[in-house]
Amino acid sequence: MAKLSTDELLDAFKEMTLLELSEFVKQFEETFDVTAAAPVAVAAAGPAAGGGAAEAAEEQSEFDVILEGAGEKKIGVIKVVREIVSGLGLKEAKDLVDSAPKPLLEKVNKEAAEDAKAKLEAAGASVTVK
């Protein structure tokens, strides 16, 4: 088989759909026993390990909203969960609230995270934003 240059490989990737690229990455990971996400996790852990935790917190742009507990007003919390998490039915929202602590929103901006936290706390839930 002829060796392809980097430019030729990039041109081939540009022709592929996202689904095809996703399948390619999965096969690549299995074939070479690697994960594409490993360098990102190491890079993210670097600043925190270096003692710059305050700087890392200021630069954070994605937040997770975690439901810690429903409190005494479970029905109100279920209603708010359905409002915040799109596409949830009543049963799914109830199961989510019953199985707390659970993440409700992941990788959202600060405004959305604070808004969700305020609504959930107003309904009686205990919530953390990370």
Curated annotation (Swiss-Prot):
Record key words, sorted: Ribonucleoprotein, Ribosomal protein
Pfam families: Ribosomal_L12, Ribosomal_L12_N
Taxonomic superkingdom: Bacteria
GO BP: translation
Alphabetical list of InterPro entries matching this protein: Ribosomal_bL12, Ribosomal_bL12_C, Ribosomal_bL12_C/ClpS-like, Ribosomal_bL12_oligo, Ribosomal_bL12_oligo_N_sf
MF annotations from Gene Ontology: mRNA binding; structural constituent of ribosome
One GO location term (cellular component): cytosolic large ribosomal subunit
Ribonucleoprotein is among the record's keywords: yes
Family: Belongs to the bacterial ribosomal protein bL12 family.
Role according to the record: Forms part of the ribosomal stalk which helps the ribosome interact with GTP-bound translation factors. Is thus essential for accurate translation.
Oligomer status and interactors: Homodimer. Part of the ribosomal stalk of the 50S ribosomal subunit. Forms a multimeric L10(L12)X complex, where L10 forms an elongated spine to which 2 to 4 L12 dimers bind in a sequential fashion. Binds GTP-bound translation factors.
PANTHER family found in the cross-reference section: 39S RIBOSOMAL PROTEIN L12, LARGE RIBOSOMAL SUBUNIT PROTEIN BL12M
Name of the protein: Large ribosomal subunit protein bL12
Species this protein is from: Mycolicibacterium gilvum (strain PYR-GCK)
Upper lineage: Bacteria, Bacillati, Actinomycetota, Actinomycetes, Mycobacteriales
